[in-house]
Amino acid sequence: MNAKVMLVCLLVTMLVMEPAEAGIWSWIKKTAKKVWNSDVAKKLKGKALNVAKDFVAEKIGATPAEAGQIPFDEFMNVLYS
């Protein structure tokens, strides 16, 4: 098989596969967006945020409200000191 025929086969394959892959990726993106914005995910994100604030507060010896206000750099310095 010469190079020109191989190139044509490759281009036809790409033209056929690209719409199919685009459909799959758009479905995955749409589903992930629905899951991320669901009520269960929002509750879990809120719980994770509260646990993280409590962890930081315990680690630095501050109240959770103060721990939520510190900059990220200071938080990382406290964790590794």
Curated annotation (Swiss-Prot):
Residues 1-22 form the signal peptide. GO terms for cellular component: extracellular region; membrane; other organism cell membrane. The keyword Ion transport applies. Keywords: Antibiotic, Antimicrobial, Cytolysis, Fungicide, Hemolysis, Ion transport, Membrane, Secreted, Signal, Target cell membrane, Target membrane, Transmembrane, Transport. Residues 66-81 form a propeptide. Coiled coil: none annotated. It is found in: Secreted; Target cell membrane. GO terms for biological process: defense response to bacterium; defense response to fungus; hemolysis in another organism; monoatomic ion transport. Expressed by the venom gland. At high concentrations, acts as a pore former in cellular membranes and causes the leakage of the cells. At submicromolar concentrations, degranulates granulocytes and has a weak hemolytic activity against human erythrocytes. Also strongly inhibits the production of superoxide anions. Has a strong antibacterial activity against Gram-negative bacteria but is less active against Gram-positive bacteria. Also has antifungal activity. Belongs to the non-disulfide-bridged peptide (NDBP) superfamily. Long chain multifunctional peptide (group 2) family. This is Antimicrobial peptide Con22. It comes from Urodacus yaschenkoi.
